Amino acid sequence: MRSNMHQGHVARKRFGQNFLVDDSIIHGIVNAINPLADDVLVEIGPGLGALTDPLLERVPQMQVVELDRDLVERLRRRYGDRLQVHAGDALAFDFGRLAVPGRPLRIVGNLPYNISSPLLFHLMDYADHVHDQHFMLQKEVVDRMVAEPGSKAFGRLSIMLQVRYHMEHVLDVPPGSFNPPPKVDSAVVRMIPWPRTESGRLRSPHADCDITVLGDLVTAAFSQRRKVLRNTLSFLRDQIDFEAIGFDLGRRAEEVPVGEYVELARRLGGDASDRSAA
């Protein structure tokens, strides 16, 4: 049985710590990120520096957000001025204050699986400051993020993130690549925010809408996943003439494309691109 101790540090379950130790996977992730010397690189949860080390071979400085106080001090001692360490919870961190005019953030990380979905939604607030994001996540979560309509994995997470990002499944990572090994398979995803026009609209294939309205709509739609939308969205009949717009309520929630949910949200909340901006 593999010990939870790695490089003199005991992995803490409450922080969801699983340290990446597979060199081939590490190099694959760094190559996928392909950092350039002038990038503003931000790592969430650097841990013991498995990604930090090879990334600092390509960039002169980085910023990291780390919650574990023991690791914060260790990182500061090890990297000195090359690493600006922000001690705190990424779920409450203001990533916007790291942005540099004309140099959007490149955010990376082996994210704690116990907070991955809330953290992804938190980061949506800063998408206008971001060039791209590369994250290690539970494979099931990545599958849901990139899922197509009609698949079992397609759901609220798929819709909410696909409206704001173009996403790609980069590579799979087996449990043995970590110490301690998690009980699930992992994967790396690339997330590229859809840019905005000069007027503030998203250049997304799914148009633009009020994210809060969309979130409430999708939550209702998927509240009874096995039933058709006639059962979950009928309360909206006074606000939307579904027949007039050709929206089939005889489908299940996972059968409806992202664009159709966005259109419903626009009808419910109007054109609110300015409210969905970070």
From Swiss-Prot:
UniProt-annotated binding residues for S-adenosyl-L-methionine: N18, L20, G45, E66, D89, N110
Where does this polypeptide localize?
A: Cytoplasm
- Enumerate the catalysed reactions: adenosine(1518)/adenosine(1519) in 16S rRNA + 4 S-adenosyl-L-methionine = N(6)-dimethyladenosine(1518)/N(6)-dimethyladenosine(1519) in 16S rRNA + 4 S-adenosyl-L-homocysteine + 4 H(+)
What InterPro entries would the database entry show?
KsgA/Erm (IPR001737), rRNA_Ade_diMease-like_C (IPR023165), rRNA_Ade_Mease_Trfase_CS (IPR020596), rRNA_Ade_methylase_Trfase_N (IPR020598), rRNA_adenine_dimethylase (IPR011530), SAM-dependent_MTases_sf (IPR029063)
For molecular function, the Gene Ontology terms on record are: 16S rRNA (adenine(1518)-N(6)/adenine(1519)-N(6))-dimethyltransferase activity; RNA binding
- Keyword terms, alphabetized: Cytoplasm, Methyltransferase, RNA-binding, rRNA processing, S-adenosyl-L-methionine, Transferase
According to its record, what are the GO cellular component terms?
A: cytosol
Renumbered to this chain, the signal peptide range is: none
Task: Note the HAMAP family from the entry.
Answer: 16SrRNA_methyltr_A
Protein family? Belongs to the class I-like SAM-binding methyltransferase superfamily. rRNA adenine N(6)-methyltransferase family. RsmA subfamily.
Q: According to its UniProt entry, what is the function of this protein?
A: Specifically dimethylates two adjacent adenosines (A1518 and A1519) in the loop of a conserved hairpin near the 3'-end of 16S rRNA in the 30S particle. May play a critical role in biogenesis of 30S subunits.
- Descriptive protein name: Ribosomal RNA small subunit methyltransferase A
